[in-house]
Regions:
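Active-site-proximal cap/lid insertion segments
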Residues: 1-153, 161-172
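Short, intrinsically disordered, charge-balanced linker/junction segments flanking boundaries
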Residues: 82, 183-203
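A residue-level signal for beta-strand positions that form part of recognition/binding surfaces
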Residues: 113, 175, 191-192
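Generic alpha-helical structural context detector
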Residues: 134, 157-161, 179-183
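Glycine-rich, aromatic-lined ligand/substrate-binding cores of catalytic
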Residues: 152, 157-158, 175, 179, ...
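Conserved small-domain helix->loop->beta segment predominantly found in fold-type I
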Residues: 170-173, 181, 185
Length: 203
C-alpha cells in the first residue's frame, strides 16, 4: 500500500519559472490577462470579518496554479510508469482524489470552480465535488462514471473488499464500500450522506 500526498496544488503557489511563463503566454494568447479574474462579493458572514468582502475568482487564469497542475500531472505519470516498469500495473488499484474543492473565495482566490458554485470550505458543489478517479484493471471499465456520492471514509472499506479482507472485529467503519460501483453496478446506492462542518462562512 502506497499513500502519496502531493502538496500540489496548494498555497503558497509556487512552480518552476519556465512552466509559469508557459501559462502566462497561454493566458495572453487567450486574452485572459485582460480580464479581472477576481470580483468582490458579499461581506463575510463571520462576525470577526464582517468588515471584509469575499473575493471570488470567476475566471480560471492563474498561470502559477496552472503550472502546478501540470507539474502534479507529470509526477503522477512517473508513479504510473513505475508501476508499468515493475510489471505490477495490472494488479494494482490506483485512486486519485482530492480533499476539497479549489480555493476560489479565500487566501488570494487562486482558482475558479465554474460551473460549480463556490469552493473549498463551502457546502456547495465547488467545495464538495472533487476528482475521484479509480483504476482497477479487470474490474473497472475505462471511461465509465458513477453518479452516486462517494466520500473519503468510503475508501477504506472499498480497499478492504477489493483485497478480500474483513475489517477487524472491533473496528467501526463510517464509510461504505463502493466496489459494486467500480464493477459497473448502476444500481449502487449508498443512501444519504450527512456531515457536520463547523467552519461557518468559509472562515
Amino acid at each position: 500500500l502506497l499513500n502519496l500526498w502531493h502538496y500540489l496544488v496548494h498555497t503558497p503557489l509556487q512552480a518552476p519559472e519556465p512552466l509559469v511563463k508557459k501559462y502566462e503566454a497561454k493566458a495572453k494568447r487567450m486574452k485572459l490577462d485582460a480580464i479581472d479574474p477576481v470580483v468582490p462579493g458579499e461581506p463575510f458572514p463571520s462576525r470577526h470579518e464582517a468588515d471584509q468582502r469575499i473575493q471570488r475568482r470567476v475566471v480560471q487564469s492563474h498561470p502559477t496554479y496552472a503550472a502546478m497542475v501540470e507539474l502534479m500531472d507529470h509526477c503522477i505519470g512517473r508513479v504510473l510508469r513505475a508501476l508499468d516498469d515493475a510489471g505490477v500495473a495490472d494488479e494494482t488499484l490506483v485512486v486519485f482524489t482530492s480533499d476539497n474543492g479549489g480555493l476560489s473565495t479565500a487566501e488570494g482566490s487562486p482558482t475558479c470552480n465554474h460551473p460549480l458554485s463556490e469552493g473549498k470550505g463551502w457546502m456547495y458543489d465547488g467545495g464538495t465535488r472533487e476528482p475521484y478517479l479509480v483504476r482497477l484493471p479487470g474490474v473497472t471499465e475505462p471511461g465509465t462514471t458513477c453518479r452516486t456520492p462517494i466520500t473519503s471514509p468510503d475508501l477504506y472499506p472499498t480497499l478492504l473488499e477489493a483485497a478480500g479482507l474483513d475489517a477487524r472485529p472491533e473496528q467501526h467503519t463510517d464509510g461504505v464500500s463502493f466496489l459494486p460501483a467500480l464493477k459497473g453496478d448502476a444500481g449502487f446506492d449508498r443512501g444519504g450522506v450527512f456531515w457536520h462542518y463547523p467552519h461557518y462562512g468559509n472562515q
